[in-house]
UniProtKB/Swiss-Prot annotation:
Residue stretches spanning the membrane: 8-28
Residues reported to bind heme: 124, 128
One of the GO BP terms on file: cytochrome complex assembly
The keyword Membrane is annotated on this UniProt entry: yes
Keyword annotations from UniProtKB, A to Z: Cell inner membrane, Cell membrane, Cytochrome c-type biogenesis, Heme, Iron, Membrane, Metal-binding, Plasmid, Signal-anchor, Transmembrane, Transmembrane helix
Record's function text: Heme chaperone required for the biogenesis of c-type cytochromes. Transiently binds heme delivered by CcmC and transfers the heme to apo-cytochromes in a process facilitated by CcmF and CcmH.
Organism ancestry: Bacteria, Pseudomonadati, Pseudomonadota, Alphaproteobacteria, Hyphomicrobiales
Protein name: Cytochrome c-type biogenesis protein CcmE
Family: Belongs to the CcmE/CycJ family.
Source organism of this protein record: Rhizobium etli (strain ATCC 51251 / DSM 11541 / JCM 21823 / NBRC 15573 / CFN 42)
Main subcellular location: membrane
């Protein structure tokens, strides 16, 4: 092999290694991303069962039903006619209550319209609302000035 051919093989090998590393990183990120939806979004574009998502909105009035143990069922609404039934097993945040902003993370079980949440995040205090929820409420004309202030960013 000439010097030129050896150099070409080394460059091709290095580029292949870099490409493989980039593809692995992209695959890892795609597996950990949970897209944000509101009930109206899910009514327009349903997600595949067992796809991990974040569901945000307001806890529906009169929808909280406590089951056996630490199981709780409630609905998440965005102020429209759309509501999504959520089932959560675990300890709810202290600030969780009807009519308050909430972001849940989980997935729809196969063959069910019930969202199985494994994480529930509630409002931080009287003046906080997750940025995603505030943006969606504003875009739908449901945001009321002076009723709360959105956070700068949500992790």
């Amino acid at each position: 092999m000439t010097r030129k051919q050896k150099r070409l093989v080394v460059i091709a090998g290095g580029m292949s290694f870099i490409l493989a590393a980039v593809l692995l990183v992209m695959f890892a990120f795609s597996q950990s991303v949970a897209y944000f939806y509101m009930p109206a979004d899910l009514a327009r574009t349903p997600v595949a069962p067992e796809t991990r998502i974040r569901l945000g909105g307001l806890v529906g009035a009169g929808s909280v039903v406590r089951g056996a143990g630490s199981t709780v069922e409630f609905s998440v609404t965005d102020g429209s006619a759309n509501a999504v039934k959520v089932k959560y097993t675990g300890i709810l945040p202290d600030l969780f209550r009807e009519g308050q902003g909430v972001v849940t993370e989980g997935m729809f079980a196969a063959g069910s319209n019930v969202f199985i949440a494994d994480t529930v995040l509630a409002k931080h205090d009287e003046t906080y609302m997750p940025k995603e929820v505030a943006d969606r409420l504003k875009s739908q004309g449901l945001w009321q000035e002076g009723k709360g202030q959105e956070a700068k960013a949500t992790p």
